[in-house]
Amino acid sequence: MESVRVRFAPSPTGFVHIGSLRTALYNYLFARKNQGKYILRVEDTDQSRFVEGAIEGMLKSMDWAGVSHNEGVVLEEETLKQQGQYGPYIQSERLPIYQEHITKLLEEGHAYHCFCSKERLDEVREKQKAAGETAKYDGHCRENPKEMVREKIEAGESYVIRLKLPENRDIEFNDIVRGKVTMNTGDLDDQVLIKSDGFPTYHFAVVVDDHLMEITHVIRGEEWLPSTPKHVYLYEVMGWQAPQYVHLPNILNTERKKLSKRQGDVAVGDFMRKGYLPEALVNYIALVGWSPEDNQEIFSMTELEENFSLERVSKSGGVFDVNKLNWINNHYIKESTADRIVDLAIPYLIEAGYVTEAEVGKKYDWLKDLVGVLKERLDYVADIVNHVDIFFKTAIEPKSDEAREILKEAHLPELLEAFLEKVEAAEVIDDAFGKKALKEIQKEKGFKGPKLFKPIRVALTGEEHGPDLPLIIKVLGKENLKSRIQYVKEHLI
């Protein structure tokens, strides 16, 4: 079997869509599973849509996600470089290569110059639509005499170069996900291969590059499926063997419509900025369109490499459910060390005004304890600012009717006084203090279960449910504990 070579070939036109990450990931996993090569090529032939810094941003996103490539465009010390023997790996640097191959197609009659104006093309499309026909090029320039073509070029007329598809012919190819696919050329357009600016279109460049870079499997989104017969035909007339095709299903929202920016986060950068962990996002996005053989849901990258197969990729769209992503991300947050999460959380706490940069050093251990208390509740790291308020206020108000009712219980004054005595007598509020104090109160006063824990929790946090009470007690510390109990005694009971 030939050595597997796959590529991820993004266009530098803006942010990295979550679907692009999945495409890159599937290419990466397939290469790893088959001891192959995973290449990153930049497709920048549409110069009108080029966004400065997009290549660098995309490479940083892939590096963050751990989807690393063996060959192609890399970022070293903020500088774009290329590595590998099949370069250049940036399409705008390959124009002479495309020129060589388009010349061959023209000479052999498989392509032709088209001088039609935009106005004429628009008029043709409008007439076709009005007649209920498929809008496509009408072949007006297909049979222009060579002498006419030469004269128009010499006169400086603008032109594109189109693929000359045969008429009424079925083109077949096999797709690993979809099986046998057949399309008739009567339903296809004479695709533009070279634009008026001299740059190739995607359809021409991708075939030339995939062949010259010896790509064995083209794994890409299903939006390219209708164009694939043109690519297969190009391989045929160029005398090349086509790669194996794999067209991935769309990523859908929970309403089963195509995921779009208007409905929420869709860029990898959105999830990075919120503090999603890379291993969680990769784990989740792998499952959007691919089904493992069992019901396992948590996968390390190594486990994905071992278990992934293209044969288990679905034909139908995969639903992106942010609640499921949050569940997986919360799993990884809980499994992470407090050191890791606190380092990620500090910028969000600073931005929200809970601590200053100057305070971080002396409060670091306390912040780590705080994260230890809260990390089980976090959907993503930035979510910490929605849970820390109770640890920074001097006075806490009950947050629900149930909490207010708990503060009316008859035994509350005696319970709070007993707890306050334990706090005042303690030399240090450490890991052991909370459990020890509660156990002693239970023994001395006879309060136990909800009658013991809930009133103290509400007095300290305003909530009847939450993280482990002894951990809350430790994080609040002696002075906060005293002030909060005192506030409840004076103002709430």
From Swiss-Prot:
It catalyses: tRNA(Glu) + L-glutamate + ATP = L-glutamyl-tRNA(Glu) + AMP + diphosphate. Its cofactor is Zn(2+). A motif ('KMSKS' region) lies at residues 258-262. Gene3D superfamilies: 1.10.10.350, Glutamate-tRNA synthetase, class I, anticodon-binding domain 1 (1.10.8.70), HUPs (3.40.50.620). GO terms for cellular component: cytoplasm. Its EC number is 6.1.1.17. The keyword NAD does not apply. One of its GO terms (molecular function) is glutamate-tRNA ligase activity. It comes from the Bacteria. ATP binds at K261. A motif ('HIGH' region) lies at residues 10-20. InterPro entries: aa-tRNA-synth_I_cd-bd, aa-tRNA-synth_I_codon-bd_sub2, aa_tRNA-synth_I_cd-bd_sf, Glu-tRNA-ligase_bac/mito, Glu-tRNA-synth_I_codon-bd_sub1, Glu/Gln-tRNA-synth, Glu/Gln-tRNA-synth_Ib_cat-dom, GluQ/Sye. One of its GO terms (biological process) is glutamyl-tRNA aminoacylation. Zn(2+) binds at C114, C116, C141, E143. It is found in: Cytoplasm. Keywords: Aminoacyl-tRNA synthetase, ATP-binding, Cytoplasm, Ligase, Metal-binding, Nucleotide-binding, Protein biosynthesis, Zinc. Binds 1 zinc ion per subunit. It is an enzyme of class 6 (ligase). Its main location: cytoplasm. Catalyzes the attachment of glutamate to tRNA(Glu) in a two-step reaction: glutamate is first activated by ATP to form Glu-AMP and then transferred to the acceptor end of tRNA(Glu). Monomer. Belongs to the class-I aminoacyl-tRNA synthetase family. Glutamate--tRNA ligase type 1 subfamily. This is Glutamate--tRNA ligase. It comes from Alkaliphilus metalliredigens (strain QYMF). The gene is gltX.
